[in-house]
Amino acid sequence: MSTNAIAKRYAKALVQLGSEAGSVDSFNAELTRFSALLTDSRDLSAVFANPAYGIESKREVMKELVAKLQLSPMISNLLMLLLERGRISVLPQISESYGAFADELSGVIRPTLSSGLPLEASQIEEIRSALAKSTGKKVELKVEVDPSLIGGVVTKIGGKVFDGSVRTQLARIQDILQKG
C-alpha cells in the first residue's frame, strides 16, 4: 500500500473520531504542530528513524514530547501507534490529509489566488464572495503576487485552475497567429 493511501486511512479515521468527539479543529492544530516539529527538527526525525534506538527509547522520547506539547489522549495514542508500527515518518502526510478531510467536513475550501499586481482588500473580498457564492462553501483564500502573470488573476481550487491572466491570453493570441 502506498504511503499516501496509508496517510489517508489514518487521517480519515481520525477525522471521524474527531467529529464524534467534537474535536476536529483541535486535532488538526495538534497534528499540524507535531508534524511541523518533526519536519523542522532533523535530530528528532533521526531518532525516530534510527533503528539503533530501541522502541522503548523512542517511546520515552514520544511521551516527553506529548507531555511538553500537551497533546490530547487521542493524538497521543495515534502518535504511539504510528511509532509502534514504524510509520511516524508518514505523519506529515497524515496531517495534510487530515486537514483536507476536516475542510471537506466543515465545508471549507482553500483556493489560491495569484495576481500580476498586488490586489486591494476590496478586490480580494469581492473575489472571495464570488467564490463562496458559486461553491456554496466558506472560502479561506490564499493570495499571492506573481509578476510573471503580467496582469489578471489565476485561481486554483483543488485540482482546477481558472486562468484569467494576461500571460495566458497573450499565449492564446500567439498560438492563433502561429496557426494562421
UniProtKB/Swiss-Prot annotation:
Membrane topology, as annotated: Peripheral membrane protein
Subunit and partners: F-type ATPases have 2 components, F(1) - the catalytic core - and F(0) - the membrane proton channel. F(1) has five subunits: alpha(3), beta(3), gamma(1), delta(1), epsilon(1). F(0) has three main subunits: a(1), b(2) and c(10-14). The alpha and beta chains form an alternating ring which encloses part of the gamma chain. F(1) is attached to F(0) by a central stalk formed by the gamma and epsilon chains, while a peripheral stalk is formed by the delta and b chains.
Ranges in coiled-coil conformation: none
Alphabetical list of HAMAP family matching this protein: ATP_synth_delta_bact
A Gene Ontology molecular function term of the record: proton-transporting ATP synthase activity, rotational mechanism
Disulfide links within the chain: none
Entry annotated with the keyword Ubl conjugation: no
Keywords (A to Z) from UniProt: ATP synthesis, Cell inner membrane, Cell membrane, CF(1), Hydrogen ion transport, Ion transport, Membrane, Transport
Annotated function: F(1)F(0) ATP synthase produces ATP from ADP in the presence of a proton or sodium gradient. F-type ATPases consist of two structural domains, F(1) containing the extramembraneous catalytic core and F(0) containing the membrane proton channel, linked together by a central stalk and a peripheral stalk. During catalysis, ATP synthesis in the catalytic domain of F(1) is coupled via a rotary mechanism of the central stalk subunits to proton translocation. This protein is part of the stalk that links CF(0) to CF(1). It either transmits conformational changes from CF(0) to CF(1) or is implicated in proton conduction.
Family membership: Belongs to the ATPase delta chain family.
Gene Ontology CC terms: plasma membrane; proton-transporting ATP synthase complex
Gene, per the UniProt record: atpH
Subcellular location: Cell inner membrane
InterPro entries reported for this sequence: ATP_synth_OSCP/delta_N_sf, ATPase_OSCP/dsu
Protein name: ATP synthase subunit delta
Name of one Pfam family that matches: OSCP
